[in-house]
Amino acid sequence: MDGHGCSSSQAMCRGAFGNVATRPAPFPRSAAPFVVAGESLGALRDKCHAYFYDSFSSFTGVDCCYGSRFDILLGSYFNTITLSHFLETGLSIACICVKFPELKYAEDGIVQFVVANPMIARSDCEVPSRPSYTYVTKKWSRTTLTSSLSICGPALELLTGDALDGTEIANFSRARAMNQLARDLKLTLDSFERGTVHHVLGILIRKAPPMPLLQPLMAAMARERDMNVVARANILSAMKNAVREHLFFMDKESRGDPQDIARGLLSLINCTLPSVSDTRVTHVGPGGRPIDGVLVTTEAVKGLVTQALTLTASEATVPAMYGELSISGTNLVTALLMGKAIRNFNEAARNLLNFADGNVDVSDFPDIPQDGEDAPRTMSVNMSLVTVGDSLVAVEALERIYARTGVPYPLAGNVDLTFFFPLGLFKPHKDRYAIGGLILPDTAEAAVDGRLFPPTEMFFFDKDEQLRSVSFESSLGTVAHPIAHGIMETLQELSQEQWVQARPPAPMDFTIQRMSQQPPRAQMVEFLTAVATAVTAPHPSATLINRRSTDQFLSHTNPFLQLEVHPFYDVYRVAQDLQTPSDAALFAPVEPSTLAASRRLCNGDIPLPLSSADFRSSRGRQLAACGAMLSSQAAAAIETTLSDPNYPVAFYVIEACLHGDETLFLESQRLVAQCIESYWVSAGGLAFVNSFAMIMYITHNLSSLVNRNCHALYAEIVAVLNSMRAAVSRFTQSGDALLQHTQEELNHLLMDPAVFPPILYDCDPIIRVTGAYAARNITIRTLGERAPVVSTRDWPPQADFGAINITLNHGPPYTARGRADGGAHHDSEWTVLNKIFYYALLPALARGRCCSVGVEFEMVYNLINTTRLPANADDLAAPEANPLHVNNLAPDSFNALLHNSGVALVDAEALVAFIAAARLRQVAHTLPLRVSYSADPGFATIDSPNTAFTDGVLYNGLIMMNYPQYDATLVASRYFYALPVNGFYANRTIVEATHRGAVNLGEVPEDLPLVPTFLGAEAYRSIRAPSYMYCAKQCASGTASAGAVAYGLMAGYFKTSPVALTHQLKSGLHPGFALTVARQDRFYADQILFARRLSESYYMGAPTTESRAENNSLMIDIHQPRSHVDMGLGFTASRMPAKLNTVVTDMGSRSQNLFDARYPGQFRYLEVADFIASEITDDDSLAMPRARPPLMLPYEAPPLPPCLERGQRATCEFLITPVTADLKYFYGPANPRGRSSCVACMPHEDPSRDSVDRAMYDHTTPDAAFPSRATNNPWASQRFSLGDRMYNARRGFIVTSDFFSPLGKFMTPSRVEDKNRCLARLLRESATAVSSVTGNTEFQFVAPVGSNELITDPCAIFQEAYPILCASDKALFASYENPRKAVGTGARENHFAQYLIHDASPLSGVLKCNGKL
């Protein structure tokens, strides 16, 4: 380079032609026409070979003029061919092409426009307008196009003749070298043609905002509205609708009226504004009609447009020259390079290659235009012209320019869309109707229809119209992963939140009172006194939570919503100084509260607002579908008994004296049978139906002593119990025992040996767990916080009622099997049925009307001792010996109690046998037991708390159904006192009646559960308030039968551990929660771009060449500076993906397996890890290898399939969602996490991290998209919730890319913030550009940064996913019609519990599967 910034060849050129600058006849300042490229190439090959190749001798230093000749030749040739082809393309319509030879010297360029603002003449009393002008200054953008040519050393030697030896081979090689050089030169120079097109197309794309952004903005600005929050929100809403409506609009409309395509193109055209040069006419169609712009797209879209709209013309008249902007140009070299003196390339080559130094004259160029020949020159070219509305536009496809170049066509690219749909949601009762309009009553148990049950599968179509499905089993890789079952890290983070201290902890949530040495009645009175004297009612949090409706719970005003962060844990406030057990009945915290978590062992512990009573009953019907249900006769008889306010107290006395002992029952069976017969005849009820042991003994032993019809009802109860037991086996996969637990014990809570029945009369459960499950830490405490002593010896001859004895008299085994089982009286199935009766069947029948009570056995035995009996056996047959004879009805005697109870069939023999047996095995006290244990091994992960669960049990207690408050002859509280063991048996009336003399409960709220804290706390019970309140609520409402509720409770007792979920989901049982399924698909789309005419000023500088030696070869670089300036007073171009080219992904049902995609966490037991591995991967050790070290499952890439047939496999990810989530939330675009996170329309123009965090996580404010609630899924939308922990990349668990983790972009705050900033910047900058044309910015009216994402990944920038066409029952597809074409024609969406969701995505109407099947 010389000092002037020129190359050596240019410097030599100035020296060689120095005398040209002094010529008296300078070249005229006019533009030159051009010729077709084919003629130029012909001239190059046919006429100029010798002269052309001789020029290369300059590189050997023979003649410096050869270098100048070569530079001039290359520059002239390249000018001609580049611009001639560019002017023939439709892109030239959008450009003002100007030659500016001095562009390489100009670093900055400024263009100023003066725009006259329109005026309107005003009428009287109005201020008239005055002329005003807007001065617009714009800077140009400058770049340089470069292409290279290389000539190797051997070729140079051949061309210069140095390597010629006179042989024919040498001459042939030289000819080949010449031909190869000509081909290389052609390719090199042709690259400028393609480069010009690529450069201009890139400029137009950068200045063309997507139509979904531009159209709403233009509409808003047309109304001259301020860009306040409301206006931005309206624009944002319109943008979302525009994306759904206009994306792939040609596919949507091509099946209908072609005019629909015209309307889509018209929308694209109308959202742009004319340029300031619009008055100039450079390109015209037939009849001199100006061409308004150009549509640039792909060949496929061009064909559709021309076919649908019909060609208006196939030729256009375009400029044959380019404008001129020159600073100086008086020498021949500059003139030649500018093209001022060139009519065609043939003449240029002929003259350039024949001139000698100093003898160049103007006469050598006969086609030089003379003065006055400045009129614009035009030429006719082939161009497709169509009429869209009132506009004549050219349709251009430029794919041929990019063919085999390795550069992708800019108007064909990928579009990523994220779809979502629900799995397992349960519709409200009012929405469950039949297609024909007939409603099937829920109580019609005989009508077994699977469509009544909660859905467990979702069907949809893939890209090839194949029906696919996703079931709960598909989600095992997510819901059975350890990361979904840990909470310790979440607790640490949540405890730091300020709102933790905003509300005091509820003592009944966590207080476990120490059992004193006092009798149980006195301890119960102490507890009731503490409750009654509390300043504020000590409601457990669970009561306040579960009495809310779903809408109330999800409201931003719910103070408990922030604690509901995990479906498998109860998070509660607890005192930091908590002592367990506590000396106080209600622990009064002194230090600030913190948070703790307790595992929900079963899905029935999920709060009612998130797992409704209606859903539980429906799932119960699923369990009962193949099982036994109580007949109407049995249900009526039981209901008669449970609702009888005069149920004989004598029956409670008899039941207490027998205390579940089978030997006593057999000895007293005559009296029991007489009581049953009497009550059946007098009231039509079933006596002793409140006791499992009595029902079993009656069924097995009294078939010949009791009325046949009556006995059949007892047998029916037992059959239902066995059927409920069989339901557990039906939904449990077969398998070996795991850590001493059978698969059923790991799957169902009532099968768990650590869970005891609430009423015990023997020590069978205690004997089985003693020393058998060391890892479970099973402990039992009774009075004095001591462990009870199990006695298997004979009963003591006399009970000591005055001393508190903690010995549990089990007695010696009386069967061979019992002796073989270590002393147990019954097998384990007896205990299981016992638990099913007390935890499922009886609560469903009782509806909260029962209460567990302790027995004052001393008073009971004193009562039966008052029985008047014959003095000897000979008098038993005498009429006066009848216990109900008037002579025997002494006041306060047992005879009078039987008589007043209506027991008319009792005889003396039965009474004698009963009293004699009862005296042999007397019980001193009812002992309350508090059983503590850890969860089974299937729950254990390193991130789960080791909670000690506690359940209350009454040893030798009973269940009272109705307190005889209307019987004035008896004070039942002398014999029985309320001692609730759990919420199923805590009837308020009975509690008040039995303790009325000791404590006044009149001020205690009716809904406050009075379960004493010395029997456990709500947060530590295995069965919690949701199950209690469901039972009372559903039965009281009458919307479900008692049988459905009983099975519903059984369904709610299935566990939530990874092992249990494996059984349930593989067996087809609804797990008690729903899922939000998200999938991201990729589509290859053809875009269409519209640019107004003359919307860009395009400057071309003089080309230069540089040569250099490199590695024994010659490198020749050709440069040409370019610059461009936007000529618009608004956005003059817009674009939109118009046609779906290819579906890249398969749109299938492949499910994410977090064991392969995430850090897998740890199980505490190797056996559990192996079981999960074998069940989830079907023993495919390559997919999830056995863990070593034994507690961890390390990440390894999953095996790849041998091939792909339907495209790249899309991945479905799962978010656990409440079953009561609003189904309508999934009818339209929404955020999969359940709460909107789009803050682009906040009062602050630039969203900050705080504003994004508040929108995402502050649930004390309503959801911006759904203001009626704070969230639709608290388990995913809240900070540190399960969904946040699983898919928030900031937590460090995501190790896959965004594409394979479609939820990552919705769950990660940093990504959400970036997208919100991008969207806010789009709105702000676009609105500023549209509303104002003043300024001095380089990129004015250029599409804002990020606008491309509107059409490449709209889900990320809007933070919304789209619903797809799916249904929970594939039969619903049979009557489905596309709502776009079947509005009002009866498009059905519901059938009982099943539902269909319409496609509300941009693909609606694009794929065949979205239309009518």
Swiss-Prot record:
Superkingdom, according to UniProt?
Viruses
Q: Name one GO molecular function term.
A: structural molecule activity
Q: Which GO terms describe its cellular component?
A: host cell nucleus; T=16 icosahedral viral capsid
Residue stretches spanning the membrane:
none
Which first-to-last residue range defines the signal peptide?
Answer: none
Q: Which keywords does this chain's UniProt record carry?
A: Capsid protein, Host nucleus, T=16 icosahedral capsid protein, Virion
Provide the protein's localization: Virion; Host nucleus
Chief subcellular location: virion
* Summary of subunit composition and partner proteins: Homomultimer. Makes the hexons and eleven out of twelve pentons. Interacts with triplex proteins 1/TRX1 and 2/TRX2; adjacent capsomers are linked together in groups of three by triplexes, heterotrimeric complexes composed of one molecule of TRX1 and two molecules of TRX2. Interacts with scaffold protein; this interaction allows efficient MCP transport to the host nucleus. Interacts with capsid vertex component 2/CVC2. Interacts with the small capsomere-interacting protein/SCP.
* Function statement: Self-assembles to form an icosahedral capsid with a T=16 symmetry, about 200 nm in diameter, and consisting of 150 hexons and 12 pentons (total of 162 capsomers). Hexons form the edges and faces of the capsid and are each composed of six MCP molecules. In contrast, one penton is found at each of the 12 vertices. Eleven of the pentons are MCP pentamers, while the last vertex is occupied by the portal complex.
| Family statement | Belongs to the herpesviridae major capsid protein family.
Q: What is this protein called?
A: Major capsid protein
Native species of this protein?
Psittacid herpesvirus 1 (isolate Amazon parrot/-/97-0001/1997)
Q: What broad taxonomic lineage does this protein's source fall under? A: Viruses, Duplodnaviria, Heunggongvirae, Peploviricota, Herviviricetes
Q: Which gene holds the coding sequence for this protein? A: MCP
